[in-house]
Amino acid sequence: MYLALRLSAESEQDIRNGLLWDKVEPVTPSEEFHLTVIHSPESTIKLKKHTSEAWEALKAAGAMLTDEPLVAHSEGLVTFGGGIKVAALKLNLTNRLDVFRTLAEAVLFEANIPWSTQWGFSPHVTLGRGRVKLTETFPSVVTFNSMEWRE
């Protein structure tokens, strides 16, 4: 499972319009862009039975996104992955993003659910596989307006 922050429709469209994919090499753009706050190999079933102060605080922070979207500045393209590389948009780590991560860790810790620790938290939006460039119209700021746990 993972906790995803979902981009506003406008930000998702602005990102798609601001990408220039390689025309020679095969590319696979992501179907939907999001920011993974935290990842766990466990299922959300265990999480649905859990309640705590951290869980309530995280739900409240997620509900606030509708009225007060989270704003993040893009820091350019990066590449992640071992054998299969993916292009990603690196984002600055804001205090608000850090709060989401801290609360998500607390929720999983209190529920005795492990989370992936192989890499540190590096806020980014995975764009897809293949070579890509940013055009002049690429947004310098993106907004997230909802949160959800996914399988």
Question: Would you name each region that the model predicts?
Answer:
Residues M1-E151:
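Histidine-dependent nucleotide/RNA phosphoesterase domain, centered on the 2H-phosphoesterase fold
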